[in-house]
Amino acid sequence: MAINLTALKPNVVSTDLTGYITYLYGQPKTGKTTLATQMPGALLLALEPGYHALPGVIAQDVTSWSEMRQVCRELKKPEVKEMFKSVVVDTVDIASDYCKKYICSQHGIEDLADAGYGKGYTWFKDEFNDVFRTLSQLGYAVVFIGHDKEIVSEDGKSKIIRPALNNSTRTVIAGMADVYGYAHQKEVGQMSVLTLRCSDGSIECGSRFKYLDEEIPMNYKALTEAVGRAINKEAAEHDNKFITNERITPVPKAEILDYDALMAEFQTLAGELMTKSSSNGIKITSIVERYLGKGKKASEATPDQVEMLNLIILEMRDLNK
């Protein structure tokens, strides 16, 4: 794509959640998944059981990062984009664990910290961003659902509620969010609320919209209305020029991948592609290095890297069509 800066126009902000990333974390049974699946055209990516009590929900079980990558590929298809407008990740805690395991397997390490100098978490951040920011850029509203935990502040004088992720992971995921809220009940038996701002710092939350309400009822309508009010208030500072109400566009078993079968299929596909055109050699190398690393060959893939090998095969199948 040729870059032409003279063709650029001011960004137009949508007052619904299209293209935004929302992170809802909190106590169990506070309506997080219910709120998220109230969004138009919602696809629930279920990484843990619990959606069976939600009538009408459309859910896809996800049991590995390889499957998450496959879902992302599917969501790029025009016919799939016609079906879904929102993607709900329940829970982001498990998704991040799958991503870390994938990265460790890809680089032959046991833990992200083993890479040294923070490289492991950089790889994790890049991989996680690549999947979910891509969906956001495609026009999907992305919602992360997560658990909460309570910690003691550094000075030991107060308690802080925050997501149950470790510090590095939490920083990556919270940093992606346009809206970052805590779901809870103020009193037992009361309706749940969503805290979006907290002046005393006792609850981790926030937003890119500076006029967003501090607290709202725990439902989709209240959230979209709050975002709309915040955007319109900020838009008034710019004479309302850049605002639109339109959209800018049982426990599952993990799939068992057959390493030997995938290696055999790689050889078959590589042979067919090279027979069609010798120029496919560069394309095959590019696909392999994308998943195994620069300078790596498919023949060097170990059984522990079977997820990466599967993704290589999927792309080669597309290339061979």
Where are these regions (language model features)?
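Interfaces that engage single-stranded nucleic acids at replication/repair/recombination sites
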Residues: 2-3, 15, 30, 39, ...
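Long, low-complexity, intrinsically disordered polar/charged segments
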Residues: 75-117, 230-242
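Conserved GTP-binding G-domain of TRAFAC-class P-loop NTPases and closely related GTPase folds
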Residues: 150-257
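Short, well-ordered beta-strand core segments
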Residues: 42-44, 142, 179-182
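P-loop NTPase motor core
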Residues: 94-171
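Surface-exposed alpha-helical segments enriched in charged/polar residues
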Residues: 73, 77, 130-133, 271
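Conserved P-loop
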Residues: 6-7, 12-89, 93-98, 254
